[in-house]
């Protein structure tokens, strides 16, 4: 039986999964972090780090919350730059995106539901 609580460190726990610490891709034996409902990422992005390719027809809702730095998100509808700690952007199903770290940045990404892309 898996444990229904967990305490950890996002940097350490996400190291093997590009920062992702919750989601369907976590083995159920690891307990509460295995979820089909939500995905959570602690993203550490050095200046110039980017996702040059656009997502394609993602059917999840996404929230990106800036912890530090400056981080640009390009959406099919617009582009936004998160500059101030606590700035965030959210978009729903069908909005494609790419991103770039304008300065060294840390962001928290939350997506739901958690499903293979």
Locate predicted features:
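A short hydrophobic beta-strand segment most commonly corresponding to one strand
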Residues: 43, 88-90, 103-117
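Short acidic-glycine-tyrosine-enriched beta hairpin
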Residues: 77-94
